[in-house]
Amino acid sequence: VNLQEEIKRIKQIMGLLSEEEQKSYESKPIILIGPQGTGKSTTAEALAKKLDIPLIPTDMLMVDEKYEELCKNEPGVEVKITRDKGLNYSSNKEYEFCVMNKIFDDYSNQKVVLDVGGSHANWDDNYSKRMQELFNSTPNIFIFNVSNDEDETYEFLKKRREGRGEKISPENEDKFRNIISDLNNFYRGTQKISIIDKDKKSKTTDELVDEIITKLT
């Protein structure tokens, strides 16, 4: 057995894609975005591992010192990050917009998995068109939901989160509903990934990963 065949065999055992399969989609980011509770981040991690490409969690980069330094002095940006006694972070949309642009500057022509927080679904008129252009620069953007029925999605995810011991305040309930609605509207026309099957049962992480891989272009 030659070395290349052995490497291919080991990759198959590990559940990784072959080089031929790797080349079958564009050198662009794969974006996963969705509200909390959809299993998006778990799926993103598993997808990156299976494709053997880097995982880039955008929420973490919002508090990364590199992006803070790049954006903190930009016009209109407000950001405060303290790291001495745990992490405290507050910012405005101008900062988030700046960081997302810098992330795309860094990764727009790379095969990476971008795990994008659901809070990045809402952008006011000053930024919405430019954000859509940014996200549409890759053909592989996947929105995690339960169904196109926003109430069904909300109730399913609320029940799942409460089942994990989370307490959702009335204020956060409204915010959560808005994120679900914003995702359905802001990213209209992109590929949707339902986290439940036809029998209304939750799909496994492996099932979600395989579904995404079959839809890569």
Where are these regions (language model features)?
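Hydrophobic positions on the alpha1 helix immediately C-terminal to the Walker A/P-loop
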Residues: 43
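A glycine- and Lys/Arg-enriched "phosphate-lid" helix/loop adjacent to the NTP-binding pocket
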Residues: 135-186
